[in-house]
From Swiss-Prot:
Disulfide bridge positions per record: none
SUPFAM superfamilies on file: Anticodon-binding domain of a subclass of class I aminoacyl-tRNA synthetases (SSF47323), Nucleotidylyl transferase (SSF52374), ValRS/IleRS/LeuRS editing domain (SSF50677)
Name of the protein in question: Leucine--tRNA ligase 1
UniProt keyword annotations, A-Z: Aminoacyl-tRNA synthetase, ATP-binding, Cytoplasm, Ligase, Nucleotide-binding, Protein biosynthesis
Motif 'HIGH' region per UniProt: ranges: 39-49
Pfam families reported for this sequence: Anticodon_1, tRNA-synt_1
GO terms for MF: aminoacyl-tRNA deacylase activity; ATP binding; leucine-tRNA ligase activity
UniProt entry tagged with the keyword Nucleotide-binding: yes
Organism expressing this protein natively: Sulfolobus acidocaldarius (strain ATCC 33909 / DSM 639 / JCM 8929 / NBRC 15157 / NCIMB 11770)
EC number: 6.1.1.4
Length: 942
């Protein structure tokens, strides 16, 4: 909306010129350090970014108003494959990427062509993001801005990794790693399309010797080798005959497997054949020494494993189907027994499932595997299947043992026979790199790893979680589990933008690994930029960040004035640790645990963040926002269409923190219209005729808004933005409309000025631009520099609050009844009960509820079970405002009678009759007179 964006632009310029968000050390104030996960500069900010950044900004603004010295900085991630893959895609003319930039983000094609240069791409989007952050009204201290390729930041990260290496948390070893064959470096979740973390498993490989060739079979169940009766391959797929350069063996595997396994083994392809050309060849089962035939099967997927399968029809339904479809007899050799299945589990599964679809059988097969592994044991008869020289080993180590125990012994047997190996597979594949290539597993001989499996380190990180408040609370368990299961992680790349590994400048530290303790760098970023990088050595950072060393000696060594060094150290001591770390919930899988590990490892357990806030996703069109769904919504577009403050509310406050938020045009338009209504309403309200006396209705509105202050204060403290949003932008608006109606269109200007002052300040964290515009109708100061409201600012009268709230409660009861009627009523009859004995009983019931007493306990206390139950029911249904004020006596008849016109207007009826149910002369219509109770009038609608 133009109106909202115009006032936003106006006040942003004022705030910028006044430098209201710059934060420096102030020992007279308690500090709060708020940070968000910084963005990759590979495309414009979208509304998903907006949710996280605005949530943090609302919290930062709230804390400033509470009197804290708040630092909220921002920076830009230039490192990693997200940027490199976009640059490469533009370079090769990727139509999808180019179309997204032109059609979704409205970037000129002449600019897009320059994105093939990663440095230009990053710099362009850095400026775009900076401008968007300003447009969004983020209250950031822009002096502390940096990028991850700034020279000073590079020295900071290099210092961090030298520290980790010295402690022993960095290691170099041979290991399997998810790898992009095109970009030629390891990949993780942030490097893949859809942000999928490649999950690597190892598979056992068994060699089946043929006359001239070895058929390489991959399996997750090597113990079933005793029941292997054939070799299965896909006749329509390509198969490669390859030489293992390590031992000269000639192996058969699918061509797709050869391409993948070439990254794990040294292989040379000799020949390529169709699978059908290999059908009929014979091989030997290395354990039973039986001759097996190579047979065709459509169920064999050449992409999985080696594309060669040992057929075990007793325990694998798909193998049984494959052999059955050949219309020839075949042997079935059971190997595993369990109480859940008979002698031939595969046949039982097929009979139960009543399908031959591999997809439909998957869950049944998974269940069979799981039960046989956890509950099964190897049959004693397997001893009879092996030659004499194996019988002792099989009899003692395998036969009769649980499958869990026997599996390792079978592997040992196969290794002793020289027919066992291992390969690695991405179990959740196919996973694609951002460049479009399918991710494979590569075995590195000299890959650098961060040893997240180190037991001492891991234990300290888990312990540190006790010091951290995590919102939502259920995320702490998830984070604990992820930390507990963490393994060594490769953290370097061979190309791209980023920080060079200090002891191997051929390697670049990846984007998840250079963004771990970078929040410390914010504190000194604005000052160290001016220093020559040569003096930003380990001793500099040891002193500034850790307080190690002597400032006088360091000053002489580095040529930096001692006072400057001590000031830098003092700033770190003042601001750190982070008080609230904000990110999307997706970063629980990687960034958040890495962030904690590195804080504990480098800075110590006492420097972990005090709070971690994880928000849900944004959905567009009912789906999680994703490029693959074509529903990416640029933040700038949303702001242009709906207005800054509308977007701030729509992206943060229409759902609870952990839930996803649906961003839709209808919701955004509705919010924008409500903001305009509020603006116009306040503008008109302060112009209305004032009365001199303070009326009951004036005391009511003042008291009611006073009650809201604590509610909203608590909501903002705990980031319950939805409740605060509803209260500020809808409840208070409706309350003030009722105030005008109850006050016959007149106001008490002193009361209302104070009420509006509070209302505007309650808006300020959420919609700062609208709040600033409205504030200047009352005052010439800046609302962003005002204190958060306190209850003491407004007059408070319990009786006035209770009486009007009782009136509104009665209206709610009647409207609830109206909603269930097929015809609109014209007349309302209300019976009120003024019996003090019954009123006292309901008060007692309210107290019992507050004390969490049970109904049986209350019944014993009262003695009269029926009356106790009624009182308890009424007390439970009362709004909190009435419960909290119930100790005050009120005259229900007088309240309703004196506000009869208001009732008529609000209920839209022609007549209203109010009776005292205890008056003998009162007519009893439809028996409602006798059932009226205090706080629960008898109501008839006709």
């Amino acid at each position: 909306m133009d109106f909202l964006n115009e006032i936003a632009s106006k006040w942003q310029k004022v705030w910028d010129s006044e430098r209201v968000y710059e934060a420096d050390v102030d020992r007279t104030k308690e500090k709060k350090f708020i940070t968000v996960a910084f963005p990759y500069t590979n495309s414009p900010l979208h509304i998903g970014h907006g949710r996280t950044y605005i949530t943090a900004d609302i919290y930062a603004r709230y804390l400033r108003m509470k009197g804290y010295n708040v630092l909220f900085p921002f920076a830009f991630q230039f490192t990693g494959t997200p940027i490199l893959s976009i640059a490469d895609a533009v370079k090769r003319g990727d139509e999808e990427i180019i179309s997204t930039f032109t059609n979704v983000y409205q970037i000129p094609i002449g600019v897009i062509s320059k994105f093939s240069d990663p440095s230009y791409l990053s710099a362009y989007f850095k400026e775009d993001m900076r401008n968007t952050a300003l447009t969004l009204g983020l209250s950031i201290d822009r002096r502390r801005e940096f990028t991850t390729i700034d020279p000073a930041f590079e020295r900071f990260v290099q210092w961090q990794y030298k520290r980790l290496q010295e402690i022993g948390y960095i290691k170099k070893e041979k290991a399997p790693v998810a790898y992009c064959p095109v970009d030629e470096f390891p990949v993780g979740m942030h490097d893949t399309r859809g942000d999928i973390e490649p999950e690597i498993i190892d598979l056992d490989v068994i060699y089946f010797q043929g006359e001239k060739l070895l058929f390489l079979t991959a399996t997750s169940r090597p113990e079933t080798i005793f029941g292997a009766v054939a070799i299965l391959i896909n006749p329509d797929s390509d198969y490669s005959i390859v030489v293992d350069n390590k031992n000269g063996k000639r192996l058969v595997m699918s061509t797709e497997a050869f391409k993948k396994l070439s990254f794990q083994m040294s292989l040379t392809e000799e020949e390529r054949k169709k699978g059908g050309e290999l059908i009929g060849l014979n091989v030997t089962n290395p354990v039973t020494l039986k001759k097996l035939t190579v047979l065709p099967s459509k169920y064999v997927e050449s992409k999985q494993g080696t594309g060669v399968v040992m057929a075990v029809p007793a325990h694998e339904p798909l193998h049984y189907l494959a052999l059955s479809e050949l219309k020839e007899s075949f042997e079935i050799v059971p190997v595993i027994k369990s109480e859940d299945y008979g002698d031939f589990p595969a046949m039982e599964v097929l009979e139960t499932a009543q399908t031959t679809s591999a997809q439909e059988l998957k869950d049944y097969i998974d269940t069979l595997y799981r039960i046989e592994f956890h509950k099964g044991s190897i049959r004693d008869e397997v001893v009879d299947l092996v030659p004499d020289y194996m019988k002792q080993f099989v009899g003692e180590r395998i036969a009769g043992k649980s499958v869990r125990e026997a599996r390792s012994s079978v592997v040992e047997l196969l290794r002793n026979l020289g027919v066992h190996g291992n390969i690695y597979e991405i179990i959740n594949g196919p996973v694609y790199c951002r460049c479009g290539a399918e991710v494979v597993v590569k075995v590195f001989d000299d890959q650098w790893f961060i040893d997240y499996s180190n037991s001492t380190w891991k234990s300290s990180v888990l312990k540190s979680l006790d010091k951290i408040e995590i919102l939502p609370q259920d995320a702490k368990r998830e984070i604990s589990k992820i930390i507990f299961n963490m393994k060594p992680r490769p953290f370097t790349r061979s190309r791209g933008l980023g920080v060079r590994l200090p002891w191997d400048d051929r390697q670049i530290i990846d984007s998840l690994s250079d963004s771990t303790i970078y929040t410390v760098f914010y504190i000194v970023a604005n000052k160290v930029k001016s220093y020559p990088t040569s003096i930003l050595n380990e001793r500099f950072w040891d002193y500034v960040v850790l307080g190690r060393g002597d400032s006088s000696q360091l000053s002489r060594e580095l040529g930096i004035p001692k006072e400057q060094l001590e000031e830098l150290r003092m700033e770190v001591e003042y601001w750190y640790p982070v008080d609230s770390r904000h990110s999307g919930r997706d970063l629980v899988q990687n960034h958040i645990p890495y962030y904690l590990y590195h804080h504990v490892g480098v800075l110590g357990e006492d420097k972990v963040p005090k709070r971690i806030v994880l928000n849900g996703f944004i959905r567009v069109g009912g789906k999680k926002m994703s490029k693959s769904f074509g529903n990416v919504y640029p933040l700038n577009k949303a702001i242009r269409e709906y207005g800054v403050d509308t977007v701030r509310l729509a992206l943060t406050s229409t759902s609870s923190l952990s839930d996803d938020i649906e961003f839709s045009p209808n919701i955004a338009k509705s919010i924008g219209e409500q903001l305009k209504h509020i603006h116009d309403f306040i503008e008109n309200l302060i112009k209305l005729q004032s009365v001199n006396e303070i009326r009951k209705v004036d005391l009511w509105i003042s008291s009611l808004i006073s009650e809201y202050i604590d509610l909203i204060d608590n909501c903002l403290s705990n980031l319950d933005l939805r409740t605060a949003y509803k209260t500020i932008y809808y409840d208070i608006y409706e309350d003030l409309k009722d105030y005008l109606e109850l006050g016959n269109g007149k106001i008490n200007s002193d009361i209302i000025k104070n009420v509006i002052s509070v209302w505007i300040r309650l808006m300020a964290p959420f919609t700062p631009h609208l709040a600033e515009e409205l504030w200047h109708k009352l005052d010439n100061s800046l609302v962003v520099r005002q204190r958060f409201p306190s209850k003491g600012e407004l007059q408070y009268d319990k009786r006035a609050l209770l009486e009007i709230e009782y009136l509104r409660y009665t209206i709610d009861l009647i409207n609830s009844m109206k909603s269930k009627m097929s015809k609109e009523p014209e007349t309302v009859i209300i019976y009120v009960n003024e019996d003090n004995t019954q009123r006292d009983l309901i008060r007692k019931a309210i107290e019992s509820l507050k004390e969490r007493k049970s109904l049986p306990d209350f019944e014993k206390e009262v003695g009269d079970r029926e009356m106790a139950r009624l009182a308890y029911e009424i007390a439970g249904d009362l709004p909190d405002k009435i419960k909290n004020l119930a100790e005050i006596g009120i005259n229900e008849s007088e309240i309703l009678t004196s506000n009869a016109q208001f009732l008529l207007n609000k209920l839209d009826v022609k007549e209203i009759y109010i009776y005292n149910s205890k008056d003998p002369s009162t007519p009893d219509i439809k028996g409602k007179k006798s059932i009226a109770l205090p706080y629960k009038p008898g109501i008839i609608l006709t």
